[in-house]
């Protein structure tokens, strides 16, 4: 089994309530408790999958690159913040001219070289996910309080384990991840 977690940053692993506790602009802007909840989702997913990968969909992706030499400060903050909890970004979605996040997720799924058994989208904003038939795999996080909450872990896991029927069509001809 091979799962993808499409993850935003603002409103998922940070929130307004967290920012209110930050005392200095030099402090890490990522909420350790929200990151631990994402870690819990990954751990539960790994019980059913041999591979769980986090794909960055956030505007923070502009500063993140697969090659660490090309990451800016924001990219390094994400890497460091997640690495403290044993997590890492595997990749990022592309950026369309229209900044169409649902379309970017679908394009990523289409171009991804391996068979995907399930995915979930963690995002605080509604980018018209329903228009792309993605709303059933979207966990609406809370940008104001706590981002990705404990109560969202089980629904996210359920979404990973129950992919859309059309994912089979996207997977045709793709190799299984080992």
Each language-model region and where it sits:
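Short amphipathic alpha-helical segments
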Residues: 18-19, 49-50, 67-68, 132-134
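Structural motif
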Residues: 4, 53, 118-120
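Short His-Asn-centered micro-motif
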Residues: 7, 56-60, 122-124
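Active-site neighborhood of HAD-like aspartate-dependent phosphohydrolases
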Residues: 1-50
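C-terminal cap/substrate-recognition subdomain and adjoining C-terminal extension
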Residues: 71-178
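Substrate-recognition element of Asp-dependent hydrolases with the DxDx(T/V) motif
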Residues: 49-74
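Short catalytic/ligand-binding loop motif for oxyanion handling, primarily in non-cytosolic enzymes
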Residues: 14-16, 62-67, 127-131, 148
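Acidic-and-aromatic substrate-binding clefts and catalytic sites of carbohydrate-active enzymes
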Residues: 32, 62-66, 96-99
């Amino acid at each position: 089994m091979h799962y993808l977690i499409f993850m935003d940053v603002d409103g998922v692993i940070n929130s307004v309530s967290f920012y209110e506790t930050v005392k200095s602009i030099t402090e890490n802007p990522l909420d350790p408790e929200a990151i631990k909840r994402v870690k819990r989702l990954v751990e539960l997913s790994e019980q059913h999958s041999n591979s769980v990968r986090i794909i960055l969909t956030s505007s923070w992706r502009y500063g993140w690159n697969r090659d660490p030499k090309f990451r800016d400060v924001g990219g390094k903050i994400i890497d460091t913040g997640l690495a403290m909890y044993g997590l890492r970004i595997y990749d990022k979605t592309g950026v369309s001219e229209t900044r169409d996040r649902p379309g970017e997720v679908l394009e990523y799924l289409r171009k991804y070289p391996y068979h995907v058994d399930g995915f979930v989208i963690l995002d605080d904003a509604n980018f018209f996910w329903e228009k792309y038939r993605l709303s059933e795999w979207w966990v609406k996080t809370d940008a104001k309080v706590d981002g990705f909450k404990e109560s969202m872990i089980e629904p996210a896991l359920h979404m990973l384990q129950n992919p859309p029927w059309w994912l089979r069509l996207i997977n045709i001809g793709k190799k299984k991840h080992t």
